């Protein structure tokens, strides 16, 4: 094979991530031609409703997966936080690249920190996870849905529709917009979405040649962390419909996983954490999920 076709969404961030993967593949496989196949997805097109209302983040994948099934693309690049906990057959993730910045960012043109926002300030985010943590920190805030790509969201802030918005640090950094980060929202006080900051490459599991071409990009330490986070989310039956957060980091030879379930309506947060082996990420994820259930997560999730 001399050409590899990467299906990608058309947003600037998706194109950056896909070109990042393409560049890495060219370096590992001299002589391989890598081309992008930009596509529009329903998740990109429907911006007047929340993702939960129109079917969840899996909408960002379906068109790209169909392109692979039709033979129009060999693989697809995704933000791993947008990838469902269970992939449909025959798809697999042969490569999870080294993780970028997992933190969230408060972006404001007027106020330096979350606590500096005035009483009743208007904050834009459609993420239930972010809404839950905002409600816990500042119950007075007016939280307003905000959809669209990074540049669209920044434009809405700059046009005066919001006092602040919350975005992912990694997205801003990848687009050369790190200067727009007003304040970092960091673990352990503020937890990101499972796998936030990680880029994954998806392909058909029955295509060994493509799988092997992509697998050279896999970052084992990142994979261990995000697999633990996603295992916790899976054990909670979580998706983008529920406010679930998780963050794993290496401590010596072990992983330390923090998890959270929250309520976007009243800011109640439940936390749990545990250490575990990087060779047993599924067990670690279930252990933290069990800790959340013991503290009442099932009741909180049932209220959603």
UniProtKB/Swiss-Prot annotation:
The porphobilinogen subunits are added to the dipyrromethane group. Its EC number is 2.5.1.61. Pathway: Porphyrin-containing compound metabolism; protoporphyrin-IX biosynthesis; coproporphyrinogen-III from 5-aminolevulinate: step 2/4. This is Porphobilinogen deaminase. Belongs to the HMBS family. Binds 1 dipyrromethane group covalently. InterPro entries: HemC, Porphobilin_deaminase_cofac_BS, Porphobilin_deaminase_N, Porphobilinogen_deaminase_C, Porphobilinogen_deaminase_C_sf. The keyword Transferase applies. It comes from Xanthomonas campestris pv. campestris (strain ATCC 33913 / DSM 3586 / NCPPB 528 / LMG 568 / P 25). The keyword Transferase applies. GO terms for biological process: heme biosynthetic process; protoporphyrinogen IX biosynthetic process. GO terms for molecular function: hydroxymethylbilane synthase activity. Its cofactor is dipyrromethane. Transmembrane segments: none annotated. One of its GO terms (cellular component) is cytoplasm. PROSITE patterns: PORPHOBILINOGEN_DEAM. Tetrapolymerization of the monopyrrole PBG into the hydroxymethylbilane pre-uroporphyrinogen in several discrete steps. Keywords: Porphyrin biosynthesis, Transferase. Monomer. The modification S-(dipyrrolylmethanemethyl)cysteine is found at residue 240. It catalyses: 4 porphobilinogen + H2O = hydroxymethylbilane + 4 NH4(+).
């Amino acid at each position: 094979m001399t050409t590899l076709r990467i299906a990608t969404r058309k947003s600037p961030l998706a194109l950056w991530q896909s070109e990042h993967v393409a560049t890495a593949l060219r370096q590992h496989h001299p002589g391989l031609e890598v081309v992008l196949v930009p596509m529009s997805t329903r998740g990109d097109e429907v911006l007047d409703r929340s993702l939960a209302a129109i079917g969840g983040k899996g909408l960002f994948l379906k068109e790209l997966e169909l392109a692979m099934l039709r033979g129009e693309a060999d693989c697809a690049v995704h933000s791993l936080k947008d990838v469902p906990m269970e992939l449909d057959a025959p798809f697999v993730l042969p490569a999870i690249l080294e993780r970028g910045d997992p933190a969230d960012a408060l972006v404001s043109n007027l106020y330096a920190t979350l606590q500096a926002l005035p009483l009743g300030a208007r904050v834009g985010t459609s993420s239930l996870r972010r809404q839950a943590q905002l409600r816990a920190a500042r119950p007075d805030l007016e939280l307003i849905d905000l959809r669209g790509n990074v540049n669209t969201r920044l434009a809405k802030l700059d046009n005066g529709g919001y006092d602040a918005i919350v975005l992912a640090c990694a997205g801003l950094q990848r687009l050369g917009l790190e200067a727009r980060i007003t304040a970092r929202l960091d673990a352990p006080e503020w937890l990101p979405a499972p796998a936030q900051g990680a880029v994954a490459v998806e392909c058909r599991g029955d295509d060994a040649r493509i799988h092997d071409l992509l697998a050279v990009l896999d970052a084992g330490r990142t994979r261990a962390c995000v697999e633990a986070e996603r295992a916790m989310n899976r054990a909670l039956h979580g998706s983008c419909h529920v406010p679930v957060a998780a963050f794993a980091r290496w401590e010596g030879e072990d992983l330390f996983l923090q998890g959270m379930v929250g309520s976007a309506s009243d800011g109640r947060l439940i936390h749990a954490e545990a250490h575990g082996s990087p060779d047993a990420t599924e067990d670690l994820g279930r252990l933290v999920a069990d800790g959340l259930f013991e503290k009442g997560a099932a009741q909180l999730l049932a209220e959603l």
